[in-house]
Amino acid sequence: MNARRKKRLALATALIGGVAAIASLLLYALNSNLNLFYTPTEIVHGKKDTGVKPEIGQRIRVGGMVTVGSLVRDPESLHVEFAVHDAAGGEVMVTYDDLLPDLFREGQGIVAQGVLIEGGKLEATEVLAKHDENYMPPEVAEAMGQTHEKLEYDSTQKTGY
């Protein structure tokens, strides 16, 4: 092989290697920023199609209804814990260390975004609540199958305390 062909081969090899390295770094960056939506049942039992569960430490969003009677507030801080369930019976505990949205109530649809820290526990970085009694995020509405029942609230539940 002459010198000219060796240079071309080295250049082509370096170019292919560089493109492969850039592609792998790009895919890694995209994978670490993915924020997949799961229902509580999918977190506990895995996806219906594949049975795949989210991994511990994975950033996810979970949507469902806040279980009535599950809200526990720490009187000394902003820390709250509550359970989120869906129509299929799955339930996930959510912990959150910030102010909850004004419209957050037990029995209401929410979407919590955060990191899965145990099999059935999410450490939320953001909690989103619906903005009126008829609205529900599309993912939650689909996951719940619109089978939830409207709850009647007493005065303490309406104030959130």
UniProtKB/Swiss-Prot annotation:
Listed GO MF terms: heme binding; metal ion binding
GO cellular-component term (any): plasma membrane
Topology in membrane: Single-pass type II membrane protein
Membrane topology, Cytoplasmic segments: 1-8
Keywords in alphabetical order: Cell inner membrane, Cell membrane, Cytochrome c-type biogenesis, Heme, Iron, Membrane, Metal-binding, Signal-anchor, Transmembrane, Transmembrane helix
Membrane topology, Periplasmic segments: 30-161
SUPFAM superfamilies: Heme chaperone CcmE
InterPro entries in UniProt: CcmE (IPR004329), CcmE-like_sf (IPR036127), NA-bd_OB-fold (IPR012340)
TM annotation in the entry: 9-29
SS bond partners: none
GO biological process, one term: cytochrome complex assembly
Intracellular or extracellular location(s): Cell inner membrane
Binding of heme, residues: 131, 135
Family: Belongs to the CcmE/CycJ family.
HAMAP family noted in UniProt: CcmE
Annotated function: Heme chaperone required for the biogenesis of c-type cytochromes. Transiently binds heme delivered by CcmC and transfers the heme to apo-cytochromes in a process facilitated by CcmF and CcmH.
Protein name in the entry: Cytochrome c-type biogenesis protein CcmE
